[in-house]
Design a protein with these regions (language model features):
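N-terminal ligand-binding/catalytic initiation module
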Residues: 17-278
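N-terminal Rossmann-like NAD(P) cofactor-binding subdomain of oxidoreductases
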Residues: 356, 386, 398, 407-412, ...
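Short acidic, glycine/serine/threonine-rich loops at helix termini
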Residues: 151-152, 173-184, 215-222, 266-272, ...
Length: 511
């Protein structure tokens, strides 16, 4: 009775929508032109286009230039009262008129990038289930195991060239965001187009839904993903294997960018696939490239060489090790032995200074676990043999680094004592607090300048406002992956590369 009637009505409505979306001439219909973000030009359609495609009367008669549309978009953007509101406005604009969206981003990168990407994208992920309007990208659930290739074929574009994929387990420094981590692939791919001109139609954001350990999300009725604990171990790896194989089958010319996977998975997954398929991990290789580029810049500013640097990493995860590995490769390329280069990299993790004999170190850290028996330790500090140094200021005194790089997501880890020690040891200390978002940064630029009498060479992971000093306005260098991965992606597409190799990232760092 009523169920049958409802289904019949739904079928009729569906048929009507299909009919509206069809054009007898084979050209796009008015419906398609106005509701497909990649075709819609709004009031910029010319008179002849309006006549040809049946748009007369569907939009106001005034024909607008792109400049006029940009003025309106800027006005509407600035009318939003919060950064999250601005993010939602840009997201809606991308859904409605893609060409205008990218024109707006390109018109003022400094203004719009912190909204479409870090730091605002972090808040957008945390509230994704509450602000989600129109789905973007693909959500591949573990409930579809054995059918991932079939699911990927549902994507309407058949020649996808770039996928940014996350499992949502470690979004920026915010932890497990589940499928709400989709904001990261969306934001990354927006920058591929805005910064490097990669056609948006060949890019696909993907989130792998393997559950979430975020209890707040599991109890939230508006959370759009699976409300179950995460899978792990062989079950997890099998799902990733199926995804990678499905991409190769459905989109054989596609490069995969792994994004925001946890430390325990990021490096093993990269090692598992890097020599088999076209892929890279931006958190490891992209971060490394932009950090090494920052070191090159710092060397130019203080008239030193890369081989003069001794780096202390606050944080010992995949990002830190990625930077160290690329730094070592750079030094080896300049003629230094690998052993000598490794000796210039020191790490502090959640248990203290990493050293030989420290238990339960992951394999990727073993080569950076130095023998510390010959080092001079501060009076009253642990020897480092039986127990590690846990105070960062003590580690600075022992290691005497020329550069400190923060990738720990521990806010204010570079405190006044640490920074003043760096300034005492070095005429111009290199200090890079790279953790995202801004709330997780190891220090603020204004503190770094104040504690070093404006001698510090600073670059940050998230954007900070310029500093007014006695010498004038100081713009804070941003050491963000967005300066690297769009160009690498465009290079992969343009060259038809079948693998992404480390020398691509060293070359990018040197440019």
């Amino acid at each position: 009775g009523s169920d049958h009637s409802a289904k019949t009505t739904q079928m009729k409505v569906g048929a009507m929508i299909v009919a509206m979306n069809q054009s007898t001439s084979g050209s796009p219909s008015a419906f398609q032109l106005l509701f497909d973000a990649r075709l819609n030009k709004g009031a910029a359609f010319s008179e002849s286009e309006r006549e040809q495609f049946g748009l007369v009367g569907l939009i106001p008669d005034g024909i607008e230039s792109m400049d006029i549309q940009l003025d309106r978009a800027r006005l509407q953007f600035e009318q939003q009262s919060s950064d999250l509101g601005k993010y939602q406005f840009l997201s809606a604009l991308q859904d409605r008129q893609e060409r205008l969206f990218y024109a707006l981003l390109r018109s003022d990168f400094q203004r719009y990038m912190p909204i479409v990407y870090t730091p605002t994208v972090g808040e957008a992920c945390q509230k994704f289930g509450h602000i989600m309007r129109r789905p973007k990208g693909m959500y591949l659930s573990m409930n579809r195991r054995g059918k991932l290739a079939q699911v990927l074929r549902n994507w309407p574009v058949k020649d996808v060239r770039f996928i940014v994929v996350t499992d949502g387990e470690r979004i920026l420094g915010l932890g497990d965001q589940g499928v709400c981590g989709m904001g990261i692939p969306i934001g990354k791919l927006a920058l591929y187009t805005a910064c490097a001109g990669v056609p948006p139609q060949v890019a696909l954001p993907v989130v792998l839904d393997m559950g979430t350990n975020n209890e707040g999300f599991r109890n939230d009725p508006l959370y759009p993903g699976l409300r179950v604990p995460r899978i792990g171990g062989d079950e997890y790896l099998s799902f990733i294997d199926e995804f990678v194989a499905a991409v190769q089958e459905v989109f054989p010319r596609c490069c995969i960018q792994f994004e925001d996977f946890t430390n325990k998975n990021a490096i093993p997954l990269l090692e598992r696939y890097r020599d088999k398929v076209c892929c890279f991990n931006d958190d490891i290789q992209g971060t490394a490239s932009v950090a090494v580029a920052g070191l090159f810049g710092a060397c130019r500013m203080n008239a030193t060489k890369m081989s003069d640097q001794r780096i202390l990493f606050m944080g010992a995860g995949s990002a830190a090790v990625g930077i160290a590995d690329l730094f070592v490769k750079q030094l080896c390329g300049d003629g230094m032995s690998e052993a000598q280069a490794i000796e210039r990299c020191w790490f502090v993790n959640s248990r203290g200074m990493v050293h030989a004999g420290m238990p339960k170190l992951p394999d990727y850290l073993q080569r950076y676990a130095h023998d510390v028996s010959g080092l001079k330790f501060p009076v009253g500090a642990p020897s480092g043999l039986d127990s590690p140094l846990t105070r960062l200021s003590d580690v600075v005194e022992v290691v005497r680094p020329t550069a400190s790089i923060g990738v720990s997501t521990v806010a204010h880890a570079f405190n006044e004592t640490v920074v003043r020690a760096m300034a005492r040891i070095n005429a111009r200390p290199i200090i890079f607090p790279l953790s995202n978002p801004t709330s997780k940064s190891e220090a603020t630029p204004i503190d770094l300048y104040r504690w070093t009498n404006e001698k510090a060479l600073v670059a940050t992971g998230s954007p900070f406002s310029p500093i007014v000093s006695d010498g004038g306005m100081v713009r804070i260098g941003q050491c963000n992956n967005s300066f690297i991965f769009p160009g690498v992606g465009l290079g992969v597409i343009a060259s038809g590369a079948c693998r992404v190799i480390d020398s691509m990232f060293t070359a990018a760092a040197e440019v």
